[in-house]
């Protein structure tokens, strides 16, 4: 099994966390990819309106895909630096692997940008979880962990270089036939680690202010709880066939 974490070293707290977490849950065999988007602007398309942070994130994912291809891995688990993997992640992945086909992506964590519907028709059961197709590709959002096949990795590398789309623009990648099928695992087996401060560079004055403020900490904790609850209620499951249920392999 191949596991690659996306984490820029300049975000020290997050980088240290995911390194410890993967050593504990996954084992010693993993990689960490992190590209600083503030010095990688040349790699973004002139027509892109992405922020430097989004460019760096996208480039980090592309670097992970290159590693998957170079190592000739059939698939890989890509994790964000705030992911919390379950203790049985290896068992889950063995069962996910049995369902994979060329060009597949499987989100083990999904934060839809809005209320989204997913189909239970022909959903694949994996223990207490189900693999479901979206009713619309826009229902697929940011993901703290996802499985990607080598063919999908190759497709996204072709579609997003130079970088024009954020790392989690699944609809964009599907439209360009970079991904042939995308499913979500429900409920999410992967959760999010709550950090004391928002995503700001190490050494940032704003980061130090937020992290050191006792008044702001309860607000941040409440905000995280609100977002988690909102995410849990954003997915609706319907007994209707997904329009993406007959997608052909690449």
Q: Predicted regions span which residues?
A:
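An acidic/histidine-cluster motif and surrounding catalytic segment
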Residues: 1-79, 83-250
């Amino acid at each position: 099994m191949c596991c690659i974490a996306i984490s820029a070293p300049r975000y020290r707290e997050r980088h240290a966390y995911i390194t410890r977490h993967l050593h504990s849950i996954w084992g010693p065999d993993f990689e960490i990819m992190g590209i600083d988007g503030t010095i990688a602007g040349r790699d973004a398309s002139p027509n892109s309106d992405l922020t430097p942070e989004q460019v760096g994130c996208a480039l980090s994912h592309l670097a992970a895909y290159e590693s998957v291809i170079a190592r000739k891995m059939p698939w890989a688990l890509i994790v964000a630096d705030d992911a919390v993997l379950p203790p049985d992640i290896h068992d889950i992945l063995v069962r996910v692997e049995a369902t994979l086909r060329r060009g597949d992506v499987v989100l083990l964590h999904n934060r839809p940008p809005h209320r989204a519907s997913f189909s239970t028709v022909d959903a694949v059961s994996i223990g207490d979880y189900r693999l479901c197709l979206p009713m619309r590709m826009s229902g697929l959002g940011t993901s703290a962990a996802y499985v990607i096949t080598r063919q999908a990795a190759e497709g996204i590398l072709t579609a997003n270089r130079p970088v024009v789309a954020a790392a989690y623009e699944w609809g964009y990648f599907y439209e360009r036939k970079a991904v042939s099928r995308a499913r979500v695992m429900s409920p999410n087996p992967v959760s999010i680690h709550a950090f004391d401060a928002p995503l700001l560079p190490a050494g940032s004055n704003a980061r130090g202010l937020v992290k050191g403020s006792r008044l702001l900490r309860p607000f941040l904790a409440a905000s995280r709880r609100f977002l988690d609850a909102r995410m849990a209620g954003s997915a609706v499951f319907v007994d209707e066939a997904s329009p993406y249920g007959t997608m052909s392999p690449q």
